[in-house]
Amino acid sequence: MNEKNSLGLDKCFLELDNPILLFTEWYKEAKKTEINDPNALALGTIDEKGYPNVRMVLLKDYGEDGFVFYTNFNSNKGNSIKQNPNISMCFHWKSLLRQIRIVGTAEKVSDEEADNYYKSRSYGSRTGAWASNQSSILKDREELNQSIKKFKDLYKDENNVPRPDHWSGWRLKHHEIEFWLDGENRIHERLKYIKENNDWKKILLSP
């Protein structure tokens, strides 16, 4: 067993019936050990041609109702999710030799929730949400710089930058979560939670 692990998966299999409890414990430890961005995750989506796409985003909230990230809804990822809301996430914490995979369906967060998070962002991030037509082709960097200047001039009051309609959050409503723990000689430990009729079923998987 990985010596860095303070929660053996066999123990969790016996004692933890809710995957969010185990996620919380691992996430707390990742915040202590990861050099930066312990909330970084690989987000998997399917585009309109049926091809998978993966990119890194940041987890901004989570709970029994799902895992939340924010983005431009007109971006490639936003359009993919609108077309096919079946998505996945993967956290990989090298410092802990642990990984968590999450599968579920995306739904838009409420406007109130999006507004509250948007207000917590820096002034530059809020004006940047207006300035960047995410995933579109740029003629050159100066085109983006001019757009940033335009919206900073438009919204000079740092406390009064409205949230764009095209910028909001998605919540992954999870129905599968798998916890992976590095083991010697590639004999890893894997514990999977599967939601069935609002209850969680636990299974151990072969490495």
Regions found by a protein language model. Name each.
Residues 1-207:
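Binding-site signature for planar aromatic cofactors or substrates
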